[in-house]
């Protein structure tokens, strides 16, 4: 299942190294510099950028139903947590909860969100191909 992330511009090139994830499974881009696309425009931008990089020969209509994808909007201004705006909200560290299983000291918001999103998509009907989520919820 592919993961598509909209990130702050400075994080796009280094995200795979920081999180130690495969480029073939994770696509990252940012909104055009100086533009405020909003969630709808950002979703369209992210999907089209991913299609152009991974399957430039296919139309968007052909490409969308090929596989399931999790799309996370993780950029933005982060007005509530400005200290995490440069690194992206999904990389915000989350403290370990006492007595909780499966937690690790290096956990961040993304590592806590992703298992649920993957479970949702695995149980979703085959006709549903994209889960769109906000990276800070």
Give short role names for the model-derived ranges.
Residues 1-137:
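Unchanged
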């Amino acid at each position: 299942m592919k993961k598509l992330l909209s990130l702050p511009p400075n994080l796009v090139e280094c995200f795979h190294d920081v999180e130690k994830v495969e480029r073939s499974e994770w696509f990252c881009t940012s909104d055009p510099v100086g533009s405020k696309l909003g969630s709808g425009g950002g979703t369209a931008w992210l999907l089209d950028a991913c299609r152009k990089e991974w399957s430039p020969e296919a139309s968007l209509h052909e490409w969308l139903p090929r596989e399931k994808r999790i799309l996370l909007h993780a950029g933005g201004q982060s007005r509530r947590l400005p200290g995490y705006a440069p690194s992206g909200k999904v990389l915000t560290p989350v403290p370990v909860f006492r007595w909780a299983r499966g937690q690790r000291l290096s956990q961040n918001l993304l590592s806590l969100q992703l298992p649920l999103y993957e479970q949702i998509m695995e149980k979703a009907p085959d006709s549903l191909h994209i889960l769109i989520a906000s990276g800070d919820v």
